[in-house]
Amino acid sequence: MRTTITVGIAVLMLVAASSARYVVSREGTHSAATEFAPISRLMNDAIAAEKLPGGVVVIGHGGKTVFHQAYGSRKLAGEQGLDGLPAPAEPMTEDTVFDIASLTKPLATATAVMQLYEQGKVALDEPVQSYLPDFNAANDAERQRVTVRMLLTHTSGEPIDVDLADPWGLGRADKAEGIHRALTMPLQSAPGGVFRYADINYILLGALIEKLTGQTEDEYARQNIFTPLGMTETRYLPAASLVPRIAPTAVDDQSSADPGKNPHFGVLLRGTVHDPTARRMGGVAGHAGVFSTAHDVGLFAQALLDRLADRPSRFPLRQATLAVMTSPQQPGHRPGQVEAANDALRKAAATTPNTMDPLLAPHYPAIEGQELFGFSWDIDTAFSKPRGLIFPVGSFGATGFTGTSLWLDPGSDTYVILLANAIHLRGSPPISALRGDVATAAAQALRL
C-alpha cells in the first residue's frame, strides 16, 4: 500500500481557498475536474514577493500532462535585452528555454553512465582510477577506494567544487583545466563515509563518459538520450535561434576583484550556462550546462515513469537499471531504509506537528543521519524539500541552482516540474519552500 503522510492544516486551507478549476491535456481531452488554482496562487504570490521573476509548472499524472502553466516574467524590466541594452520586461511563456543547471546530472550524465553500465563498459563498484588514471596518479590509498558508485551518490569524499579563485577559463574556455582540477582536488573526507553534494563528482563522471565513448558529452547526450526521447529543444550550447526564448539568469560576475581578466564581466547570461565552472569549461560538463523546456523535461519524466511501470517507453535504459538508479544506492544502503523513513514521517506528523508552520513539519531527511540517494536522484536528504508533504520517501527528484526542480512518484504515476530563473532576480531568497509547496498542492489537487 502506498504510504500517505498526514497533511497539515495549512495545506487543507490552501486547497479549500480556491474554487477555480484548471485541466490541461496534451491529448486534447478533459480529465476529471481537478483543482490546480492553489498552484497558481503559490506561484503568483511568490512572484509578488520577489522570490522569482516567473516560472513554468508542469504536472503529469496517469500518463498525461494534466497541468502546464507559465507565470510572471522571463526577463525583468530594465535588464539587458538581446542587444545588450536595458529593455522592457518579457512575459514568461510555456515554451521558455531554461538553464536547468544541476538537472543536467540526472537528465544527461547519470543516464549516460548507466547506459555504459548496461553495455558492460562501467562497473559501479570499480575504482574511478581504473577509468581515469590521473585521478590517482600518486597511487594514494584513500583515492584508490573511490568508486563510480560513490561519484554517482555524492559519497566520494570530494569537496563541493574546483578552485575558482584564479581566472582560468575566463579569457578562453579551458575544459582540460577544469577536468584536471577535478582529478586532482584533495579529498575532504574518507570515501564512502559522508554524503556531500559535490559538483566535482559529476565533472569526473562527464570526463569518464567522454573517455569511454570518444565523444563530447553534449554529442553523446544528444544522440543517445535527448533525440530518442524527442527532446528537440534540449541540449548543451543552445543554438542562437533559441536565445530569444531563453530565460536569462544573472550577470557574469566572475573575477569581480579584477574585471579586466573577464572579457564577459557584467554581461547578462542568456544562452550561456550560469554555473561558473561549467562556463569556464566551455559550457559542456557533467554537472551543469544543459538547457531545456518544461515540455521536454516532461517527456523525460513521462518516459521514465512509463519504463518503471513496464509500459511502452522510449526511455534509453532498461526497467531493472532504472529501478536501481532511482532507489537508495549510497554505500551501506540496506533493505528497509525507505520504509523506516516513511514510518518516521508518520510518527513525526502525529506526535510533533509544527503548529507554527505545518508545511515545515516533516524532517529532511526523515531520520537524522540517514540520507538516501540514488544515482543522481535525491530520495531523502536535506535537499528533499521539493518532495512536499504528500509524496512519500521512495519518490525521487532533483533540483538546479538556477531555480529548477523535478520530482517523480512512481507510486501515484505523477511528476511535478517547476522551471524558473529565480537567480535572475538579484538577491532573491532560495525557493526550496516554494518547490515543496507546489508539489504538495499538486498532490492534493490530484487527490493522492
Predicted regions and their residues:
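Short, conserved catalytic-motif segment at the N-terminal edge
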Residues: A32-F98, K121-A123, A138, H180, ...
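Active-site SXXK
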Residues: A37-N44, V57, G63, D99-D125, ...
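A short acidic/glycine-rich loop-to-helix N-cap element
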Residues: A422-L434
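Positively charged n-region of N-terminal signal peptides that target proteins for export
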Residues: M1-T4
